[in-house]
């Protein structure tokens, strides 16, 4: 997988190819959002669940701040995606110092949220899910939910702040072409 990103960088992100040839050249493991931005790709390894197996993260760095595109673990000797989502546009994730993964998503201007996960083996286990929804007739009227139950705006942001207070997981980023 790392080799696919490196090959794309080494070949000018396949910019000289037609659309179909370009899609084939990238390969199925290269994040669609990364293909568009054409910035250097980096990877980091970190054992999130303490089982002795490092998870692989792929991203870019903007002023030293990562934008993540993929996270994988190992199952049966194969690299497996922990999430089905394509990251980098409406869905993104951050990694906290305690190993919690926060997935930030938006399905529309009227619905968005945060899902918090822990890695367990080759799976991402949902800890908590929060979302906010706007009334289609009154965009200023927001409703807040945690795990399906309505909560106050204060509770919604307090939970998110409690995770943010943990700070980011320090990661050692390496350019895929190194």
Regions found by a protein language model. Name each.
Residues 65-94:
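Extracellular C-terminal loop/segment signatures of secreted glycoproteins
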Residues 1-9, 98-178:
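Acidic, small-residue rich beta-repeat scaffolds with periodic aromatic anchors
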Residues 47-51, 73-78, 94-95, 119-124:
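A short, structured loop/turn motif at beta-sheet edges
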Residues 41, 67-69, 112:
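Repetitive beta-architecture junctions, highlighting loop-to-beta-strand starts
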Residues 39-48, 90-100:
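Beta-propeller blade termini
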Residues 1-37, 78-89:
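Blade-edge motifs of beta-propeller repeat domains
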Residues 49-60, 97-104:
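Acidic/hydrophobic-patterned starts of short beta strands in beta-sheet-rich repeat architectures
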Residues 61-65, 107-110:
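Short glycine/acidic-enriched loop and turn motifs that connect beta-strands
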């Amino acid at each position: 997988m790392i080799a696919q990103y490196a090959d794309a960088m080494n070949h000018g992100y396949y910019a000289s190819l037609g659309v179909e040839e370009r899609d084939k050249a990238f390969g199925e493991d290269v994040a669609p959002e990364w293909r568009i931005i054409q910035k250097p790709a980096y990877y980091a390894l970190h054992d999130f669940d303490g089982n002795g197996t490092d998870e692989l993260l792929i991203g870019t760095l903007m002023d030293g701040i990562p934008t993540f595109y993929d996270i994988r673990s190992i199952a049966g000797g194969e690299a497996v995606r922990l999430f089905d989502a394509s990251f980098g546009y409406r869905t993104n994730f951050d990694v906290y110092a305690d190993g919690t993964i926060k997935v930030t998503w938006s399905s529309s201007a009227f619905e968005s949220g945060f899902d918090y996960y822990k890695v367990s083996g080759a799976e991402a286990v949902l800890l908590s899910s929060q979302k906010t929804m706007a009334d289609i007739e009154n965009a200023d009227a927001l409703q807040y939910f945690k795990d399906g139950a309505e909560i106050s705006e204060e509770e919604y942001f307090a939970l998110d702040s409690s995770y943010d207070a943990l700070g980011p997981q320090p990661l050692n980023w390496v350019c895929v072409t190194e």
